[in-house]
Design a protein with these regions (language model features):
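Short strand-turn motif at the edge of the Rossmann-like AdoMet-binding core
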Residues: 77-78, 107-111
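Conserved beta-strand signature within the Rossmann-like core of class I S-adenosyl-L-methionine
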Residues: 72, 102-109
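Short SAM/SAH-binding signature in class I
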Residues: 28, 68-77
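Class I S-adenosyl-L-methionine
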Residues: 111-146
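A short glycine-rich, Lys/Arg-flanked "PGG" loop and its adjoining helix->strand segment in the class I
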Residues: 86-101
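Intrinsic disorder
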Residues: 44, 57, 62-63
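A short acidic, Gly/Pro-enriched loop at the edge of an enzyme's catalytic core
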Residues: 40-44, 66-72
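S-adenosyl-L-methionine
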Residues: 1-42
Length: 146
């Protein structure tokens, strides 16, 4: 069981909003917050001017960060039936646009409709065994194009 590995434990105990060098080749910066604010740049402290948006209205889903930022997205929303606004094609398209090439999105929701939605926006999607004692399957979606 990999959950007892020291690196696994370290990943879960590092502070939020801080760069932490896990190994010489891996720096972790955990961001916790509303995914809409994160992908719009608001949560990252990116100004509307930096995004090149002339309109001073609030940033919405279509106002994406010009340069990808994320290598990994752990998507931990409630089930689509409980929180449907978190499972839209538009939201996943925007997350895809904010990810670096070969970036990975993972979610505990392994429903076929979500797998197809992730594929529709460009991810390559795999069903994987879930964690011990929990979900039977999870999804891993990889952005294979830059």
């Amino acid at each position: 069981n990999y959950s007892y590995h020291p690196l696994y434990k370290e990943l879960h105990t590092v502070p939020w909003d801080t760069d932490v060098n896990i190994t010489p080749y891996f720096t972790l910066h955990k961001i916790q917050g509303d995914v809409n604010k994160v992908i719009s740049g608001e949560r990252l402290g990116i100004s509307v001017e930096r995004l090149g948006i002339s309109d001073k209205s609030p940033i919405n889903h279509s106002s994406l960060i010009a340069n990808p930022y994320f290598d990994l997205v752990y998507f931990d929303a409630f089930a689509p039936e409980k929180q449907p606004e978190m499972w839209s094609e538009e939201l996943f398209r925007n997350i895809y646009a904010c990810m670096n090439a070969n970036g990975i999105l993972t979610t505990y929701c392994a429903k076929g409709v979500i797998r197809r939605l992730l594929q529709a926006v460009g991810f390559t999607v795999e069903r994987l065994p879930g964690p011990p004692g929990g979900k039977r399957e999870i999804l891993r979606a990889t952005k294979t194009k830059g």
